[in-house]
Amino acid sequence: MEHKEPWRATLLTIFPEMFPGPLGLSLAGRALEEGKWALDAVDIRGFASGKHRSVDDSPFGGGAGMVMRPDVLDAAIHGTPAPGPLVYMTPRGRLLNQDLVRELAAGPGVRVLCGRFEGVDQRLLEAHGALEVSAGDFVLSGGEPAALVMLDAIVRLLPGVIGKEESLAEESFEWGSLEYPHYTRPQVWDGRTVPEVLLSGHHEKIRAWRKRQAEDITRQRRPDLWDRYVAAKNLSEG
């Protein structure tokens, strides 16, 4: 029987010691130990030349900060063969959402370029057809924290990582809406009680309540998601 290689994340970074970081713990960590996915953190400086192994230089046209050199990054990419698309973490990229996470999880893996300083020479991104991805509308000190967020979201979707598939199916974004509220023991806490319907044992009523809650939360907090959810619902209902 042909052995299937695990889904692989290859990180190109000047701080390889940041990985696996939190990905070495909990669900992702156990899955990593069990070989359900693999991770390689590659030090970009290992592909730089000169005494100081510099990976950056001043920008043409002037301006603040430094830019990561295309020749050094190109050597790192070619020197580290790995499956999957080259992903560059940047605030100007395609917004990371559950659709993109599913798309990346369905492939053989990803190569993630973690930028630093003012960013990466544009020619490098064009030469390699990099997929630019943003973790959100904010700026970080580098691409590593954003890469950790993206990889955690991906690993959760890999086969065998989460025991109950229904846990995935009921999470935020899986059906286009945010998730409903959760409750556990004690039944009364700080004068607040669990909604009666959840104690009823009536599964259909519980499902209907959870659906209403999810829809209300989505409509109130994320009108952009709500509009898409309603459009998709109307389309499915014909």
From Swiss-Prot:
Keywords: Cytoplasm, Methyltransferase, S-adenosyl-L-methionine, Transferase, tRNA processing. S-adenosyl-L-methionine binds at residue 115. Belongs to the RNA methyltransferase TrmD family. Specifically methylates guanosine-37 in various tRNAs. It holds the Pfam family tRNA_m1G_MT. This is tRNA (guanine-N(1)-)-methyltransferase. It is found in: Cytoplasm. Homodimer. One of its GO terms (cellular component) is cytosol. It comes from Paramagnetospirillum magneticum (strain ATCC 700264 / AMB-1) (Magnetospirillum magneticum). The gene is trmD. Signal peptide: none annotated. GO terms for molecular function: tRNA (guanine(37)-N1)-methyltransferase activity. It is an enzyme of class 2 (transferase). It catalyses: guanosine(37) in tRNA + S-adenosyl-L-methionine = N(1)-methylguanosine(37) in tRNA + S-adenosyl-L-homocysteine + H(+). PANTHER family: TRNA (GUANINE-N(1)-)-METHYLTRANSFERASE. Its EC number is 2.1.1.228.
